[in-house]
Amino acid sequence: MRCFKVCLLLVLLLSFSKACPEILKDRLVLSQLVHEIRDPSTDKKHFRKALEKIGEYLTLEVLQDLNTKHVEIETLMRSKAVHALCDEDPVLITILRGGIPMMIGMQKVFPNAEAGFLGMARNEETLKAAISYIGIPNVHGKCVIIADTMLATGGSLLDAIKIVEKQNPKQIILVCAIAAKKGIERILDHNPNIKIFAAATDPILNEKGYIVPGLGDAGDRSYGMKLETL
C-alpha cells in the first residue's frame, strides 16, 4: 500500500494508519462537522459555518507542520518567558465559490496573512476546469496553503497548484473538507512533496466526477444555485 503524504483527520483510514502512523489523527469535532455538511437538511448559513470551522481546525493542524521561531517576552510580572511562534504567515489561496467559507476559517488562524483567489468553472462533460480569474500575491519562497472544499478528480486543485508553482513557493499545502483517493493520487503523482490535510476521505467518484457519498455542490449549498449562462 502506498504511503500517502496526507494528513487525514478521520478514523475512517485506519488501514492507512498502520502503514503510515503519521497520517492519521482522529478528531471527533471534524467528524461532527463533516456529518453536518453531508446532511441535505443543513441550511446555507449552517453549511457555511461548518465549512468555516473545518477550515479553521484543519489550519490549526497545518500550523503544527510550519517552521517556528522562539520569541522571548517580558510579562507584567517582570519575568521573561519564551514561546514558539510561527516563523512567518503563509499565503492563503482558495478557489471560488466553494472554498470561501474555508478561507474565512483559515484567516482566523492567520488574520494578517496575504490571500489569493482563483476562479474556475468545471465543464460537466469533460470534467476539466476553465480558469476565469487569477488574483494571487507573490508567493516566491513562501509557504502556500490552498483550500477547496472537495478534492475529487483533482483537476481544479492541480490547475491551482500549477499556477502557484510558477512562482517557486517554498511549500504547498492543500486543505480540503473531503478528499477522494483518486484525487489524492493525482496530486501526489504530480508533486509528492505536497501535503494534504482533509477532514474525511471518500472512496468513489461517480461518472460525473463527483465524490460519493460526498455532500453535493459546495458552492451551491453555500450560496444558492447559480445560472449556467447569463
PLM-predicted stretches and their roles:
Residues 2-9:
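Sec-dependent signal peptide recognition
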Residues 9-230:
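PRPP-associated nucleotide enzymes
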